[in-house]
Amino acid sequence: MASTRMAHISTATSSSSFPIHGLLPKQATKVESFREKFPNYDGRNVRVAVLDTGVDPAALGLDGPNKVVDIIDCSGAGDVKLQEVAAKFNADRSTLQLVSPTTKRTLLVDPSWPNPSGVWKVGTKRAYDLWPTSLVERRTRERKQAFDVSHSALFQKALDDLATYEANEGAEKPSDKNAAAQHHEDLKARVAVLKDLAKNWKDPGPVLEAVVFHDGVNWRAVVGGAEGDVVDPSQGEPAAYRHNVIDLRSKPRMTDYRLEREWSYFGEMDLLTFSVNIVGDGDVLSIVTLSGTHGTHVAGIIGAKTQDLSLIHI
């Protein structure tokens, strides 16, 4: 994923007339003479802590091996309390099913995942509680557009059903008048409820589900539920919004970032990078992500390095 993005940026830069050599002017700042005098003063064996809005390990120049060595959340915003839950096989024993204690959604996990203890822990987190404001605003707009399309179809049908009934009112037999009156009130109530729903719509955002287990060596976490598929809001809400099953079987099983330096995205719709740390004896999952862009900007100034864009390096 990162290599594809790198190739795209490299191609765009090489074919552009934008003067990237002026972004970090080496002559005016005497960097070239400094490097000639001290060729080994290039940051080797130096570790810098950036206490800021978070650092994106997928950012260009920071995604190399051993570049970002650890990422932690000092705010506690990404903490997810975990509860042990029972697991059961599906009918053909190809999938393990867990039930989220908070949302009651069914979570599907792969029984081939190493878990010698057989202990599965589950936690829930509102995505908007830890996503940056700019992303929340964008996803809210997109989700509102999808809602409006779906709502318009339902509202129009309710209006049509009411109009059809009222056009034929009086055709019912005397014995059916009570039932007909009740049906009429029901049709009017549907229109009123849908009208009120549009007026008072609020977006709670995606609800994340996390499963944590110990593979015999390390604690591992799998996170899902962030609407991973790219959808066109103009086509209305996807059916997946209403599903009560979260399939985690294809999600990465991540451990503490410092151990394997692995990160992922919540979903294709948000493309927000996150990593994890499991605290204590698997009691709390810390989902580590970004609250803004400044921390990544600072980290890039400190240590970003890309071979294809050497002109912009100090």
Give the location of each predicted region:
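Conserved small/polar residues in nucleotide/adenosyl-binding loops
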Residues: 312-314
